[in-house]
Amino acid sequence: MRGADFIIVGQGIAGSCLAFELLERGASVSIIDDDWRGAACLVAAGVINPITGQRLVKSWRSSVAHPYARGFYKNLESRLRGKFFHDRKILQLCKSPEESELWRRRAGESGYAEFMSEPPADENFGALDDSFGAHFIGHSAWVEPPAIMRAFRDYFIARGVLEVGAFDFTRFSPEDGTYRGEKFKKTIFCDGWRVLQNPYFSWLPYRPAKGEILTMKTDEFLPEHIIQTLLG
C-alpha cells in the first residue's frame, strides 16, 4: 500500500462510493478491506424509498436525494459498465381501514402528490391481498448491491488502489497521519457495524439493527413492483 491523499477503511457501499467520487475528482486513494467478511451491503435489499415509517412520511430531502441518487447510479453503470439500478414503483398494501385512511390523508398533503398515487383500475395484483387498498410510491428504485460491489471491486483493482486484508490498528498513527509507515492526509473509516470493534469509535452508543431475509418461490402471479406493507 502506497501513501495517498486518503486511506479508506472498508469497501462497502459507503466506502466504495466515497472512493469513486474522490478518484473522479483527482484525489489519490488507497482502500483496505477484509474481503467483505460479514459485510451488510452484500445482503442489503437495495431499495430506495422516499416514503417511510408507519406514519408514511417523506424521507429527509427526498425531493433532492432521489434525482441525485438516480444520476449517480446511472453514471456508475456507464463508468463501471454494468447494470444494477432499476427504476421501480413500490406497491404499498394496506392491512386495515385505518392504514388506508392514513394514506388518503397523507397523499392529500402538500409535497406528497409527486410520491403517492393510485394504481390504474385494471392493475393486476395477482396473489396479493388488496382488501384494504393498494397504492403506489413513486420516485423509488432498486439497486442490486452484490452486482455494484463486484463492479466497484474490479474498478479499484484495475487502478491498483485496493488491498484485501484487515486494517492493523497497531500500525496506525493518527498523530502523524501514517499507516504502516506510509503517509496519508486523511483516514476515513467506512467499516459499518464493525465500528463496534474500532478503538477510536467503539465508545459511541451504536445499536446495530439486525434484519432477516426470506427467499420465496411461488407459482402464483405477482406484479413487477417492489411490494411492501407497514410493520406492526
Where are these regions (language model features)?
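N-terminal Rossmann-like FAD-binding beta1-loop-alpha1 element of flavoenzymes
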Residues: 4-30
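Short beta-strand/turn micro-motifs composed of small residues
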Residues: 10, 33, 94
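Conserved Rossmann-like nucleotide-cofactor binding loop
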Residues: 14, 37, 194
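Flavin-dependent oxidoreductases
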Residues: 17, 175, 180-232
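Conserved FAD-binding subdomain of flavin-dependent enzymes
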Residues: 21-24, 34-88, 101-103
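Short glycine-enriched loops at secondary-structure junctions
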Residues: 34-37, 121, 232
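Internal, well-ordered alpha-helical segments in soluble enzyme and binding-protein domains
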Residues: 65, 145-152, 183, 210
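Flavin (FAD/FMN) cofactor-binding and adjacent substrate-gating region
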Residues: 78-159, 163, 170-175
